[in-house]
A protein has these predicted regions:
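N-terminal organellar transit peptides
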Residues: 1-189
Length: 189
């Protein structure tokens, strides 16, 4: 006798008809496992996020020592623009610019071996002396606001003040998970 799997019977009656619906969804897994480099390397990834439907899911896996903060900002904007559910995952190292991306997801998952480094931006300026001074003054104000917004409720106010003064904040997966409980934010910041 042949053992065939039977489909579950859906109860029906005159008052309630149950119609099974098949919903097609896509799941995209993106692995950011090396330096976050210049934005043009991420255009396909950002296009996937921006064109994904509300039923789709995008998982951003981070095992990364950081990189260009401007590129991280562009990725964060793509997360904000996405209709899909964005889950960011600490798969290993989540340092520097990667930590900014992590905190922008709709949901965050942390592996038992994950680590995180939060620090203030690094950068450089070039040009005529007065132009350099203007850029440095602008960067001070701009990045101070940006980092306060990203790390709000994840880091304490004192940690953010010290971070802006140059102190690094390191944490393991247990500490990351504990702090994530404090965050209530709109999608993508």
């Amino acid at each position: 006798m042949e053992n065939k799997e039977e489909k579950p019977k859906i109860p029906q009656n005159d008052f309630c008809k149950i119609q099974p619906t098949i919903v097609a969804t896509n799941r995209y897994d993106v692995y950011l496992n090396s330096l976050i480099d210049k934005p043009h390397y991420y255009f396909d990834f950002m296009e996937i996020m921006r064109s994904a439907d509300a039923e789709d899911e995008v998982y951003i896996h981070l095992n990364n020592n950081g990189g260009y903060v401007d590129t991280a900002m562009q990725i964060i904007n793509a997360i904000k623009d996405s209709s899909a559910k964005i889950t960011t995952c600490v798969d290993g190292a989540c340092h520097s610019a990667a930590s900014l991306i992590l905190l922008s997801g709709d949901e965050v998952k942390v592996s038992g071996h994950g680590t995180m480094l939060c620090h203030y931006y690094s950068g450089c300026a070039s040009g005529k002396g007065n132009d350099i001074e203007k850029q440095v003054d602008f960067d001070k104000t701009y990045y101070k606001k940006f980092f306060k917004k990203i790390y709000k409720n994840f880091l304490t106010d004192d940690e953010i003040k010290n971070l802006i003064k140059g102190t690094d904040v390191w944490m393991d997966s247990k500490e990351i998970l504990k702090r994530l409980k404090n965050i209530v934010k709109p999608k993508g910041l």
